[in-house]
Regions:
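Surface-exposed, polar/charged faces of alpha-helical domains
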Residues: 15-22, 26, 55-59, 86, ...
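Early exported N-terminus immediately downstream of N-terminal targeting peptides
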Residues: 1-76
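Low-complexity, intrinsically disordered terminal/linker segments enriched in charged
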Residues: 134-180
Length: 180
């Protein structure tokens, strides 16, 4: 599932590079449709929110999940287009997650002239379909990174305000540790 989805996405990005480069909305729509097929946004959002998710409504969780995904697409969508050559993914193996929460699928992103990059996908079965809820690139967890990044803003402002700021672009999901 992971290798097929990753290969499909990389191939489509390469084939439609000029279209996506001149039409960012088309790129966002494509990535959004792929995320909906393969990614468990709401569960990932609950993990990112951590204790802030307790007592939150499903609507607030969805609001945050969508805002975070939109922010990530705006920030990283064009980066995906700039991958040169013909990258591919190589499956290394899979293992069960603790507590029977799903599986960890270990892969490597292989690019000509570069060392392979380890990428792990944490997946769970949702109504008979395997969905990704966390991605670890070179040992760095997307969920843990964003949980750390958003903890203080969530404590200070709450889910709705942080989601609103993510959606407006005044706050971005990304590697910075201060929420901006």
């Amino acid at each position: 599932v992971v290798i097929d989805a990753s290969t499909r996405i990389l191939t489509t990005l390469q084939q439609r590079r000029s279209e996506f480069g001149s039409n960012p909305a088309s790129l966002r729509n494509y990535i959004d449709s792929e995320l909906n097929r393969t990614f468990d946004r709401d569960y990932a959002a609950r993990l990112v929110l951590g204790p802030h998710a307790r007592g939150a409504s499903d609507a607030d969780i969805k609001l945050f999940a969508d805002a975070m995904a939109d922010s990530l697409m705006q920030r990283y969508g064009s980066t995906l287009l700039n991958i040169q050559g013909k990258p591919s993914f190589r499956l290394k193996g899979e293992s069960p997650l603790p507590g029977n929460r799903g599986v960890r699928v270990s892969t490597e992103l292989v690019r000509a002239g570069s060392e392979p990059t380890p990428v792990e996908y944490w997946m769970r079965n949702v109504n008979g379909q395997w969905k990704i809820f966390d991605v670890n690139i070179e040992g760095i967890s997307y969920v843990q990174t964003f949980r750390n990044q958003f903890d203080t803003p969530l404590r200070q402002k709450g889910i709705k305000q942080v989601a609103s700021e993510l959606h407006s672009g005044s706050m971005q999901a990304g590697p910075a540790g201060n929420g901006k």
